[in-house]
């Protein structure tokens, strides 16, 4: 079991920070290259003529996250838990819009492509509540944790195997003391001994460059989740409590008056949340035997630096370029004429010898520099997956086959990055769904879409499902293309395709009732990025029409049978003779 004494836990935190900082050694350099020399007082000596980081982010982020995600929820127990799955689905889709989780995901997308991203999911009081109602509603919320403040077990071989995760936070000391008066779990005596601004150098806040602020009397502390520790007073996993949260801060008097290196500023408390913990980590590429992923930008930064070095060298050569004209020093008038006459002016010189006027060029870019820059740029584009077609720079020199091959290779890489990001988003929404499913303090209206689907005038989501329902029985899937950007032309084309599909399918539905048209339309809607395609067909109206047609057919058959049975023997013989006469008997 992990030693969770304050001093040992703080030493674990320091070790985790050192390991994290080794992966973020060039983080600030990448940011400086991304924003350029005109942003925020960045040193002009760090200027990158080939701003690959900006280009990669501007081309990739809109393809990864552009809109709020939508989810579909199914269950392994469709008979008994089908209604629960439908309620969680409407609750999650309403929650993504109400909290605008897209804004958090966009910031985390930049972190993911530069280094790695982290989201903290926790329960918070709902905004806009009536204090006189007597009921305090909660719902989950997501927060971006900067890579500079996140910590994870440095000896873990992967994120699920880590024995602890956590993050640094900064708050006003006065606010903590006020909260300690209300909440006895805070250790007021320890908070009073904390020195303000101690540890701020590791908080991710970089002073200077116009960010020098006066003393704010802030303190630095850490929240650490240890999943393997269960407190005696914890209700246990059966009631939604998994692991323990420790809040620790450095001891100012360590080594002088107190042998403890740190102390708990809050009593350890059971963690109420999903068994996967409060943190969700985003990354692009897996690196064996380390919890930190590899970002596509960090993987190519060596080639970016090399390309920029050669471009700077070529730029310096171009700046040193000179074009001189050498003349015979004996002819003063010739030298003056060459110097003073304007461009393209004809200067008549009697008895001019061509050897007396010699043009001379010094410096400038060489062919070798141009060739190597082009080779380095092509290598960077090849490894990063960026090509001219993505940039919109199609000159026509490449064939359609070459453009198609380049687009296919880039699509494979981008599709993998999108898949990794979407899987991390699904994990975040799974944590949100856990709170919606288990916490009875979650109450909020679902809106018009849910009202139409559920057939209720004003449906509300109410958390804390039936005890027989288990969240592990639910399966969450992101709707295809729900987070991606689509162009106006693509939307128009999809609308026309949807119209044609509905027109063809609607006419075939009554004739082939044995086909699962709803499932077929759902699959076609996923391919067209129109997840609600099946809702365009009113299945209840279709059933009514089919039943009406069947009833009409049965009524006609019954009327014909009644007419036959009502005929007298003479009428029956007369009808038979009439039929026989028609066929010539």
PLM regions: where:
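Short low-complexity stretches enriched in small and charged residues
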Residues: 72-80, 280, 335, 382-386
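Extended, helix-rich architectural segments
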Residues: 1-242, 250-253, 258-261, 372-374, ...
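Short, flexible segments with low predicted structural confidence
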Residues: 63, 84, 278-279, 351-353, ...
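Catalytic nucleotidyl-transfer cores of nucleotide-processing enzymes
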Residues: 239-342
């Amino acid at each position: 079991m992990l030693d969770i004494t304050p001093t040992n836990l703080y030493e674990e935190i320091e070790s985790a920070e050192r390991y994290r900082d080794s992966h973020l050694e060039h983080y600030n350099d990448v940011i400086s290259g991304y924003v350029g020399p005109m942003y925020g007082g960045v040193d002009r000596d760090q200027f990158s003529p080939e701003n690959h980081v900006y280009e990669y982010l501007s081309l990739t982020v809109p393809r990864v996250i552009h809109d709020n995600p939508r989810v579909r929820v199914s269950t392994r127990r469709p008979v008994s838990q089908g209604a629960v799955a439908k309620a969680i689905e409407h609750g999650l889709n309403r929650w993504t819009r109400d909290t605008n989780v897209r804004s958090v995901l966009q910031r985390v997308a930049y972190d993911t492509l530069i280094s790695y991203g982290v989201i903290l999911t926790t329960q918070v009081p709902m905004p806009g509540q009536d204090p006189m109602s007597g009921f305090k509603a909660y719902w989950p919320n997501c927060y971006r944790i900067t890579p500079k403040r996140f910590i994870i077990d440095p000896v873990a071989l992967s994120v699920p195997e880590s024995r602890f995760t956590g993050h640094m936070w900064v708050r006003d000391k006065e606010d903590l003391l006020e909260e300690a008066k209300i909440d006895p779990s805070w250790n007021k005596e320890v908070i009073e001994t904390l020195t303000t601004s101690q540890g701020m150098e590791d908080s991710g806040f970089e002073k200077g460059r116009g960010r020098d602020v006066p003393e704010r009397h802030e303190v630095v502390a850490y929240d650490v989740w240890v999943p393997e520790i269960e407190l005696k007073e914890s209700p246990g996993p059966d009631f939604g409590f998994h692991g323990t949260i420790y809040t620790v801060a450095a001891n100012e008097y360590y080594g002088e008056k107190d042998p403890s290196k740190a102390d708990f500023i809050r009593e350890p408390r059971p963690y109420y949340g999903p068994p996967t913990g409060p943190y969700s980590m985003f990354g692009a590429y897996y690196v064996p035997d380390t919890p930190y992923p590899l970002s596509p930008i960090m993987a190519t930064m060596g080639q970016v630096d090399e390309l920029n070095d050669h471009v700077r060298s070529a730029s310096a050569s171009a700046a040193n370029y000179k074009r001189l004209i050498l003349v015979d020093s004996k002819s003063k008038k010739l030298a003056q004429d060459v110097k003073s006459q304007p461009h393209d002016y004809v200067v008549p010189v009697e008895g001019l010898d061509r050897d007396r006027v010699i043009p001379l060029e010094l410096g400038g870019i060489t062919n070798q520099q141009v060739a190597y820059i082009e080779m380095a740029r092509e290598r960077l584009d090849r490894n990063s997956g960026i090509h001219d077609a993505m940039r919109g720079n199609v000159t026509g020199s490449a064939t359609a086959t070459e453009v198609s091959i380049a687009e296919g290779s880039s699509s494979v890489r981008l599709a993998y990055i999108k898949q990794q990001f979407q899987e991390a988003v699904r994990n975040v929404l799974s944590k949100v769904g856990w709170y919606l499913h288990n916490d009875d303090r979650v109450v909020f209206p679902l809106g018009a879409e849910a009202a139409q689907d559920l057939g209720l005038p004003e449906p509300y989501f109410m958390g804390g499902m039936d005890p027989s329902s288990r969240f592990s029985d639910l399966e969450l899937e992101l709707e295809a293309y729900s987070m991606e950007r689509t162009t106006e032309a693509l939307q128009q084309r999809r609308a026309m395709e949807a119209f044609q599909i509905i027109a063809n399918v609607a006419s075939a539905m009554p004739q082939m009732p044995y086909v699962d048209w709803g499932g077929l339309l759902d699959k076609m809607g996923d391919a067209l990025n129109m997840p609600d395609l099946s809702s365009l067909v009113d299945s209840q109206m279709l059933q009514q029409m089919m039943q009406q047609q069947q009833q009409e057919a049965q009524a006609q058959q019954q009327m014909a049978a009644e007419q036959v049975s009502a005929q007298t023997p003479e009428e029956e013989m007369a009808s038979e003779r009439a039929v026989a006469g028609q066929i010539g008997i």
